[in-house]
From Swiss-Prot:
Its main location: mitochondrion. Residues 1-39 form a transit peptide. Residues 49-124 form the Carrier domain. This is Acyl carrier protein 3, mitochondrial. The keyword Cytoplasm does not apply. InterPro entries: ACP, ACP-like_sf, PP-bd_ACP. Belongs to the acyl carrier protein (ACP) family.
């Protein structure tokens, strides 16, 4: 998978429009990058829904998907007919959108938008505590 990813990075441009991550100011006056503002407390207040909607919108923008078929549980391979190269491009777009890195072994296990949102949410508190 690493070879495929490297090859894609060298030869292909993604046709997914990704909005830049904005800096958000928290109550202490410090600025932080958007997604890292989510905590487990925010998840209880709808943070997962926000992440899920961002993931779904990103998948809908991918030019090889039928927007009407993209749902939380639509399987990337079975329902959306994405092959391994398409999925690799999609994972790269998700990494860029959320400013995270998804290891290849984890990326292989992400089969739908819901899995991606759950993974992002599970990784966010770890990233926030490292900063």
């Amino acid at each position: 998978m690493h070879c495929i990813r490297s090859s894609i990075l060298q030869h292909l441009r993604l046709r997914v429009s990704v909005r830049p991550t904005s800096l958000l100011q928290n109550e202490n006056g410090f600025k932080s990058i958007g997604i890292f503002n989510f905590t487990s407390e925010a998840a209880a207040d709808g943070g997962q829904d926000q992440i899920l909607s961002r993931v779904i919108e990103l998948v809908k923008k991918y030019d090889k998907t039928n927007t009407s078929e993209v749902t939380e549980r639509a399987d990337f391979q079975k329902d959306l007919s994405l092959d391994s190269l398409d999925k690799t491009e999609l994972v790269m777009a998700i990494e860029e959108e959320f400013s995270i890195e998804i290891p290849d072994e984890k990326a292989d296990k992400l089969t739908c938008c819901g899995d991606v949102a759950t993974y992002i949410l599970s990784e966010t508190p770890t990233k926030a505590s490292e900063s």
